[in-house]
C-alpha cells in the first residue's frame, strides 16, 4: 500500500540523502534542479511530514517510437505489465480517496498518459477532491480526443507539458516516429485554447540532438505561436537505445557540428531573460557566457 511505502525504512533512507545535502542517489548530470544549484551553499529544508507531490511512472506504453527514447513500439493492454499497472493505479487512487492534504499528482514520465490504458484507467477513477491537482507530460497527439473524457483532471490541471522534438514537418516526423505534423499542430491549437479557459501552465519540451539543433529558434517561435509559458531545451541523454549515440551527441566538443551548435545556442540567448517574460529555459544545456 501507499502507507507502507511512505512509512518504510527505504523511504526514510532515501529521504535522508536529501536531508543531509548529499543527494547521493540523484543524477546531477540529468536533474535540472541540481544543475541549477550550488550545493556548497544550499541548505536543504527538513522533509515535510505530509506528501505534497507524487510522480507516476507505472506504464511505458506510448503511441510513438522516438529514436531518442526506445528502439521499438511499447504498448501494454493485456498481460503481466498491464495488470501490474492497473493494480498500482488502483492502490494510488485508493490512497488519494482518503488523503486530506494538498497534493499534486504528475501523470506520465515513462509513457504517454492518453495512449496508455493504465493511465487512462487512473484518470477515469481518480477521486474528485479539491485538494488534488495534476500535472501531465504528453506527446499531445491524442490530447484533443481524450482530454474531454477526463474533465475533472483537466479542470484541476496545474501544468501541461508537451514533448515535441521538431519545429518543422520534416524534422518532427523523422524524430517522432508515428506522429504527424498536422495532427500535433491541431492539438497544440486546442491546448492553447484550453489554457485560456483553465489557466494551466503550458510547457513545451525539446530534446536537442544532431537532427534538430538547427531548429532551436524555430521551436521557440512555435511556442510563442501557441502561447506556451516556457520552452525547455534539454540535452539528449544516452538511454542505450542509440546504436550511433556519438554521432547524434551534438554536445560532444569533438563532434564536427559542435561549434555550429554553440553558435546557434548563443543566438537564442535573448529569449532567455532579456524579455519581461522569458520563454526559454535550458536546464541541461551549456551556454557560453
Regions found by a protein language model. Name each.
Residues 1-33:
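Membrane-interface junctions of multi-pass transporters
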Residues 23-35, 61-71:
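Local cysteine-cluster metal-coordination motifs and their immediate loop/turn environment
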Residues 48-50, 55-87:
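Canonical Radical SAM [4Fe-4S] cluster-binding loop centered on the CxxxCxxC motif
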Residues 98-100, 126-130, 151-156:
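Short, conserved loop/helix-junction motifs that constitute active-site signature segments
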Residues 117-124, 145-152, 215-216:
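Distinct, well-ordered alpha-helical segments
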Amino acid at each position: 500500500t501507499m502507507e507502507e511505502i511512505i512509512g518504510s525504512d527505504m523511504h526514510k533512507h532515501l529521504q535522508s540523502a536529501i536531508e543531509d545535502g548529499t543527494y547521493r542517489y540523484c543524477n546531477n548530470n540529468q536533474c535540472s534542479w541540481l544543475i541549477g544549484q550550488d550545493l556548497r551553499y544550499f541548505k536543504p529544508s527538513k522533509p515535510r511530514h505530509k506528501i505534497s507531490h507524487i510522480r507516476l511512472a507505472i506504464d511505458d506504453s506510448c503511441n510513438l517510437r522516438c529514436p531518442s527514447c526506445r528502439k521499438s513500439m511499447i504498448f501494454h493492454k493485456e498481460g503481466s505489465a498491464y495488470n501490474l499497472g492497473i493494480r498500482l493505479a488502483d492502490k494510488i487512487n485508493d490512497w488519494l480517496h482518503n488523503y486530506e492534504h494538498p497534493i499534486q499528482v504528475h501523470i506520465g514520465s515513462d509513457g504517454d498518459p492518453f495512449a496508455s490504458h493504465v493511465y487512462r484507467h487512473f484518470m477515469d477513477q481518480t477521486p474528485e477532491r479539491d485538494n488534488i491537482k495534476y500535472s501531465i507530460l504528453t506527446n499531445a497527439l491524442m490530447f484533443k480526443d481524450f482530454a474531454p473524457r477526463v474533465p475533472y483532471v483537466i479542470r484541476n490541471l496545474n501544468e501541461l507539458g508537451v514533448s515535441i522534438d521538431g519545429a518543422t514537418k520534416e524534422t518532427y516526423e523523422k524524430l517522432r516516429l508515428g506522429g504527424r505534423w498536422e495532427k500535433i499542430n491541431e492539438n497544440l491549437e486546442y491546448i492553447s485554447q484550453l489554457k485560456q479557459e483553465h489557466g494551466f501552465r503550458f510547457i513545451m519540451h525539446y530534446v536537442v540532438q544532431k537532427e534538430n539543433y538547427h531548429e532551436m529558434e524555430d521551436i521557440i517561435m512555435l511556442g510563442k505561436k501557441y502561447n506556451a509559458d516556457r520552452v525547455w531545451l534539454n540535452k539528449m541523454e544516452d538511454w542505450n537505445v542509440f546504436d550511433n549515440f556519438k554521432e547524434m551527441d551534438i554536445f560532444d566538443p569533438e563532434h564536427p557540428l559542435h561549434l555550429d551548435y554553440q553558435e546557434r545556442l548563443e543566438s537564442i540567448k535573448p529569449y532567455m531573460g532579456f524579455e519581461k517574460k522569458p520563454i526559454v529555459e535550458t536546464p541541461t544545456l551549456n551556454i557560453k557566457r
